[in-house]
Amino acid sequence: MVRIAIAGAAGRMGRNLVKATHQNPLSELGAGSERPESSLVGVDIGELCGIGKQGIVLVDNLEQAVEQFDVIIDFTAPASTLANLALCEQHGKKLVIGTTGFTDAQRQTIEQAAKKIPIVMAPNYSVGVNLVFKLLEKAAKVMGDYCDIEIIEAHHRHKVDAPSGTAIGMGEAIAHAMGNQLSDVAVYAREGITGERSRNEIGFATIRAGDIIGEHTAMFADIGERVEITHKATDRMTFANGAVKAAIWLAEQPAGFYTMTDVLGLNDL
């Protein structure tokens, strides 16, 4: 039984992670945290998340419950995730990262830590999205040289980063399959008289509206035909169940930097 701590357990995603951990027969809830200023610190996590009293209260720092868990699942914010990364390094814990919006320097810090502890980091934990990443690699190898490639993503009004980590992941899958770095070919905004698009660029468009959980489309457009690969999420439990699956898998792994491709065994597809 893998004991899991949920960072940001009172948030939208955090509550789903608590439920997913509780429902999975191979995991159990060990701890949960919230920001120190939250009025929910000290509240029973189970009662808060609708799974019944668990005898585990929200703490303002997972250091206080470090003996109660094996793996942290963190879908919070970069600064908070890096603090939990340091805690995991210090105490030999494992870390599943669903946070997005890291700088290149912050990502390097995470990759460096993975030399000491096991870490899974992914922009999206749904099985469907990670299958889409593989499909995009194959589509890019076949169509990338002669098609215009655009990525459109939509999320709820509360999402703070753009484009989404999943959209970036889609762009990276396409760019790498074509032998490019995404930073060299990405175009994140167009306005005014932009001139004709170049053939090798990957364009991004972002929508923030209402309560959209997550929709992503990659478009390969030629003259006379267009291929679109789309994923639509309708329930956050999809991501939560995938993250718990990753935590259970990670519990048996040595130190290293892993992705959901590793967790799902998609490398050979």
Swiss-Prot record:
InterPro entries: DapB_C, DapB_N, DapB_N_CS, DHDPR_bac, NAD(P)-bd_dom_sf. Pathway: Amino-acid biosynthesis; L-lysine biosynthesis via DAP pathway; (S)-tetrahydrodipicolinate from L-aspartate: step 4/4. NADP(+) binds at residue 35. It is found in: Cytoplasm. (S)-2,3,4,5-tetrahydrodipicolinate binds at residues 156, 165-166. The active site is at residues 155, 159. Its EC number is 1.17.1.8. NAD(+) binds at residues 8-13, 34, 98-100, 122-125. It catalyses: (S)-2,3,4,5-tetrahydrodipicolinate + NAD(+) + H2O = (2S,4S)-4-hydroxy-2,3,4,5-tetrahydrodipicolinate + NADH + H(+); (S)-2,3,4,5-tetrahydrodipicolinate + NADP(+) + H2O = (2S,4S)-4-hydroxy-2,3,4,5-tetrahydrodipicolinate + NADPH + H(+). Signal peptide: none annotated. GO terms for cellular component: cytosol. Keywords: Amino-acid biosynthesis, Cytoplasm, Diaminopimelate biosynthesis, Lysine biosynthesis, NAD, NADP, Oxidoreductase. It is an enzyme of class 1 (oxidoreductase). Pfam families: DapB_C, DapB_N. Belongs to the DapB family. Catalyzes the conversion of 4-hydroxy-tetrahydrodipicolinate (HTPA) to tetrahydrodipicolinate. This is 4-hydroxy-tetrahydrodipicolinate reductase. It comes from Vibrio cholerae serotype O1 (strain ATCC 39541 / Classical Ogawa 395 / O395). The gene is dapB.
